[in-house]
Swiss-Prot record:
GO molecular function, one term: ATP hydrolysis activity
InterPro entries on file: AAA+_ATPase (IPR003593), ATPase_AAA_core (IPR003959), Clp_ATPase_C (IPR019489), Clp_N_dom_sf (IPR036628), Clp_R_dom (IPR004176), ClpA/B (IPR001270), ClpA/B_CS1 (IPR018368), ClpA/ClpB_AAA_lid (IPR041546)
Protein name as it appears in the record: Probable ATP-dependent Clp protease ATP-binding subunit
Keyword presence, Iron: no
Compositionally biased intervals (Low complexity): 151-171
Gene designation: clpC
Record-stated family: Belongs to the ClpA/ClpB family. ClpC subfamily.
Binding residues annotated for ATP, in chain numbering: 232-239, 569-576
UVR domain mapped to chain residues: 441-476
Entry GO CC: cytoplasm
GO biological process: cellular response to heat
Pfam families, sorted: AAA (PF00004), AAA_2 (PF07724), AAA_lid_9 (PF17871), Clp_N (PF02861), ClpB_D2-small (PF10431)
Species name: Chlamydia pneumoniae
Gene3D superfamilies from the UniProt entry: 1.10.8.60, Clp, N-terminal domain (1.10.1780.10), P-loop containing nucleotide triphosphate hydrolases (3.40.50.300), UVR domain (4.10.860.10)
Amino acid sequence: MFEKFTNRAKQVIKLAKKEAQRLNHNYLGTEHILLGLLKLGQGVAVNVLRNLGIDFDTARQEVERLIGYGPEIQVYGDPALTGRVKKSFESANEEASLLEHNYVGTEHLLLGILHQSDSVALQVLENLHIDPREVRKEILKELETFNLQLPPSSSSSSSSSRSNPSSSKSPLGHSLGSDKNEKLSALKAYGYDLTEMVRESKLDPVIGRSSEVERLILILCRRRKNNPVLIGEAGVGKTAIVEGLAQKIILNEVPDALRKKRLITLDLALMIAGTKYRGQFEERIKAVMDEVRKHGNILLFIDELHTIVGAGAAEGAIDASNILKPALARGEIQCIGATTIDEYRKHIEKDAALERRFQKIVVHPPSVDETIEILRGLKKKYEEHHNVFITEEALKAAATLSDQYVHGRFLPDKAIDLLDEAGARVRVNTMGQPTDLMKLEAEIENTKLAKEQAIGTQEYEKAAGLRDEEKKLRERLQSMKQEWENHKEEHQVPVDEEAVAQVVSLQTGIPSARLTEAESEKLLKLEDTLRRKVIGQNDAVTSICRAIRRSRTGIKDPNRPTGSFLFLGPTGVGKSLLAQQIAIEMFGGEDALIQVDMSEYMEKFAATKMMGSPPGYVGHEEGGHLTEQVRRRPYCVVLFDEIEKAHPDIMDLMLQILEQGRLTDSFGRKVDFRHAIIIMTSNLGADLIRKSGEIGFGLKSHMDYKVIQEKIEHAMKKHLKPEFINRLDESVIFRPLEKESLSEIIHLEINKLDSRLKNYQMALNIPDSVISFLVTKGHSPEMGARPLRRVIEQYLEDPLAELLLKESCRQEARKLRATLVENRVAFEREEEEQEAALPSPHLES
């Protein structure tokens, strides 16, 4: 009886005997076999039972409730097999024969138990609300997954199956190919039916994409070359469009030519898996093609279409694409493909014969508004999964924030992921198991351990009492869990805009408060914020903020960049700093600043670095330095630093960016600059001002600044083309820094230094006399504010560094006051009024 049993099946029998002995039973019944199957923890039977929600502890409790423990007698030898168990073993052997298996495994043992209609095991399953027919159905499905065989046309099990494929059987014993309505062996083995999944409501609803689905239907209705391929970036919804077609087929919203069609996704990896010998892969794919031809109502869908190029090819073998080509050209089979733009170019376009057999449908990412509509359609699915309530504001925030801050990915995929993670975050943070439940579970576990110890010491009366106590505790636990589940369903936690912003904050590092701040508030406060960071350039800040407000309110042409500015003026007055602060305030961080040093583009051929090298040249696959960064992060500030150094022909590239808000890279892709702020800096005219001596503290009136403006504007018109200047929103001329401005800059730098010293429990007190001294030392009309940094390093940071290195100064918190000693700065402790550090070295002014 046991000669065909697998090792796992034999192990189940051993475990079943142990369970019988534990329960003091002198027999081996079907209930013990069921417990042995679950205790084994592996195999087809266990997978099926777990999928249906049965675990070992639950089944053991139910067995104990139904039959309890036997009398306290010593059982010698193995327990005897009951008649039902013997019959179940016979049924298991019969099931194995029917399934054409030459072994008896755990799955056959479970099928054998299901045949015993009056057995305890079957009663246990019914008490746990498990339908035996559902168990059998799941076992057959599991076997079909694990025991995939070659299709009849490729089976080598017997000569009869090769000579008469229509009479051969599937792994489950079903006759194949004899009737159109029966299951398709090869397609069933290597694919899954999308139309069937629609009937079972297993697919998410498809919102929008009507034009793409319509084009898909038109191509499928052609007589020849009726094979569409969906091309688009990862995450734009290519597979969703095919699922939308499946939904239309089920709803009969397609032409007569496509009605009653079945849309089956082909799993190419599964088809290749397990092919050991030459010709096996070709036989499998030919079997699929033969079945598609025979039934005539099959549409194949191959996701990642580029994988058919080279798939299965070995020495002397033919790859999948060459096997499919003739049938695709003649229209014998219809295939829908989906792949990315890059993979299509690398693999499909190189094979001209394959390319002409497919008709391209380019899938573009949806807009933010379209993404919000898609999220509305998916909202119910995610609410049910996470048991939360998703607000309308959360949907809008997921679409807008993902578009603006999540880069390198595409809508709607990144917005859906954001909403999904926000729902998971809310659920995890607010729906933890109550403390009472956790305490009760711990109490049950302790009672269980005490019961087992009592059994081990043969204190059976105590064990029986603990068993009854454990049973009561479990009933109480079940009741509390049910109340908790009901409470969760009745009181759904909302997922709002703040929850979505927190997820974006985790991914990008931008504070969530800044993400949720209203755009109008941000724009209204922008001017004041920039004036606090960029000192002495109020006119420039006002001009910039005016232009940005025009763009963001929709008054400006939407096809141009958010703003395009040319910053002119002497060096060191804050041109690059203003660009950096705009990136921080408008787009959340310094990483939103794309800085292009135009001194790297002094040669004409250097333009290829910006857009990408032409095909055939070194670096073509890498793309352009500028275009790739903007494509990955469209919401950004692009800073072209010192444009007067670039070759004049390179400046012509920027005309298209400034006027149309786009630039075509070396791959032919149009890179969108409409959400970017374009800033160019230049020192044009600065040398003329230096020669005339009209810079720095020498300015006496407003008219002097007018003279500077005229000189810089004259130099700008002389160096730059009129068509370039006319495309700019603003040409902003920065003022030379005055003494008051330098003092404010010194204060800002000292505040930064003070914040760094907090790690060492030090604080600085810098009086105005020291500030004036530093301003005098750092004033350089030709260099602007940059010398101030060196002055702070020499007069403040160097002596402070010596303080930090001294062991005696690391003991307690202290506040240091700076004082002037002759022509140097000294530090002394404020509370002790004594010198706490060496003075800085004497430096000549």
